[in-house]
Amino acid sequence: MPERNTKLPTTAAEPARLALQIGGFSLGLWCEKGMPAVLDPEHVPFLSPSDVNGACDLEFDISWASALSLPDAAPDFASGGLWSAHRDNTGTKFYFTSPVFGSEPYKAAWLDPSFSRGHVLLNRSSFQSHDSLFPLEYPMDELVLMHRLALGEGVEVHALGLVDQDSSGYLFLGHSGAGKSTTARLWMRQPGVRLLSDDRIILRRQNGVYRMYGTPWHGDAGVSSPATAPLSAIFFLEQAPSHQVVPISQPQAAAELFARAFLPHYVKSGIEFTLQFLDQLTRSIPCSIFRFAPTDDAVEAIRHAHA
């Protein structure tokens, strides 16, 4: 993982252009000239220089605003203090607030209905003392991709994803504390194993193949990779005194996946698509509960079950 932020080449005369690849999507940013923009260390591996000169799947214009205020209308969804979403026929507007900056939003973003074009406004007064900033800092990057996925593109899940020596792609799901980071550390000690993320994985179906994508949003093990791999098997983690792999029914697997999915629950069409996507996924990929103890032979238990 990079040890420090990567500064974007903004100058007083020219805006900054950069592109990222996350979850199979290209994200392009045009930052207002002179803006002290940087990439968070977690995002540096996701830089995509090959996309800089072309049109990206999601394009953002980033600029300053002298002031920002919340709308009078009630939001369609409020996270409980960090962000809120307001929808109308022109698209979706997000407002980001923090006690650090008072009641006024420190950032706002408008996305068109297809979540392919957006405009991000940064409240200049909130960033006066900042030498650098990342315009798409979490949770905005995840929010935008979560909404784009819900338009028929895939789903983000609370999971660890990895690729074994034989190219088998394993997905381990669990809420916080279920053992994703512990499982990640067990597999990290195995030669030839590639980890995609220890906390958030994007799932998509492309050319008839279900694929996993790593994301920048890692867990305690600090694993984040832009890599992708076909999905071979799904395991729901449960900590136990010993190892046991227990196949589960397709309806139960779909329900367990939905409980660990990130999606805009206030968008009916997004819920309907996600349910359909997970139903089809669990009819195609074997799903099991993995009861395990945090010992190295847990790895062999998975390999034996998938053999």
Question: Language model features by range: what are they?
Answer:
Residues 1-176, 186-194, 201-307:
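A noncatalytic interaction/capping subdomain that flanks phosphate/NTP-handling catalytic cores
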Residues 178-180:
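Conserved glycine(s) of the Walker
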Residues 183:
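Hydrophobic positions on the alpha1 helix immediately C-terminal to the Walker A/P-loop
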